[in-house]
């Protein structure tokens, strides 16, 4: 089973449909972990633990704001070495999961490159050769989409990739089966071989 954090939006819990399709494609069962509030929710950790201990992988999707459940799940995955893919907002959370810094302290977009674009491909990223992302894709430069409003300026974890304007585009937690954060949205570029490789590697690590 693969856990996916839902995004609270009033009376609706949203989950990207492309992620559900991809999880099903790889023969896994998606388990939605649904917050009931958008940020400072108080929740029963014992109930969440019962869900998390049965998961082989976790996906932290993009969104506009995370909940306290997000923070708990990210730390749980790191501490228990559960494979985890953190996308956009999830990547931003991964970058500060060793602190109590909130989203407002992340850096707003302020560069010449369009980091919040509706284009299929928004810009290039440059991948460090000694990184997990390079091990997966085996390329030093690829094109990605981009829809994030915040840059990463904290350096928790190993930096895997940058944009040409110097902002962090991917990071990993070392010495784990698979914990990778990306600022782009691979689920929306699944027809791109580079994005498929990310999911291939993630789901292989979940076996």
Regions of interest found by a model, annotated:
Residues 1-89, 96-97, 107-136, 140, ...:
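N-terminal beta1-alpha1 cap of cysteine-dependent amidohydrolase-like domains
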Residues 180-184:
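Active-site-proximal beta-strand elements of phosphoester/diester hydrolases
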Residues 145-153:
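A glycine-rich beta-turn/hairpin centered on an aromatic-Pro dipeptide
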Residues 101-102:
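Conserved hydrolase catalytic core segment
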């Amino acid at each position: 089973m693969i856990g996916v954090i839902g995004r609270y939006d009033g009376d609706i819990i949203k989950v990207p449909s492309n992620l559900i399709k991809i999880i099903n494609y790889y023969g896994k069962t998606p388990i939605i972990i649904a917050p009931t509030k958008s940020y400072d929710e108080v929740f029963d950790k014992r109930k969440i633990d019962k869900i998390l201990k049965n998961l082989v992988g976790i996906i932290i999707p993009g969104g506009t704001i995370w909940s306290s459940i997000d923070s708990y799940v990210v730390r749980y995955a790191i501490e228990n070495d559960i494979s985890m893919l953190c996308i956009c907002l999830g990547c931003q959370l991964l970058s500060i999961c060793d602190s109590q810094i909130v989203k407002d302290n992340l850096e707003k977009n302020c560069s010449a490159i369009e980091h919040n674009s509706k284009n299929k491909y928004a810009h290039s990223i440059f991948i460090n050769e000694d990184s997990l992302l390079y091990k997966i894709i085996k390329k030093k430069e690829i094109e990605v989409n981009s829809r994030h409003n915040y840059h990463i300026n904290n350096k928790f974890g190993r930096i895997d990739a940058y944009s040409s304007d110097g902002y962090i585009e991917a990071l990993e937690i070392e010495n784990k089966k698979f914990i990778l954060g990306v600022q782009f949205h691979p689920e929306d570029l699944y027809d791109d071989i580079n994005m498929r490789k990310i999911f291939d590697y993630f789901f292989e690590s979940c076996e």
